[in-house]
From Swiss-Prot:
It comes from the Eukaryota. InterPro entries: Ergtoxin (IPR012622), Scorpion_toxin-like_sf (IPR036574). Expressed by the venom gland. The keyword Nuclease does not apply. Its main location: secreted. It comes from Centruroides limpidus (Mexican scorpion). It is found in: Secreted. Coiled coil: none annotated. This is Potassium channel toxin gamma-KTx 4.6.
Length: 43
């Protein structure tokens, strides 16, 4: 689910990050971005 994407992610500070995107899409969201080293999923 979405929270596990955030927990697992250690990404660059901002912008597109493939693993966030993939994880978020699996959780049913449209896309994922990186914000302050955490994945944020956009519904």
């Amino acid at each position: 689910d979405r929270d596990s994407c955030v927990d697992k992610s250690k990404c660059s500070k901002y912008g597109y990050y493939g693993q966030c995107d993939k994880c978020c899409k699996k959780a049913g969201d449209r896309a994922g971005n990186c914000v302050y080293f955490k994945c944020k999923c956009n519904q």
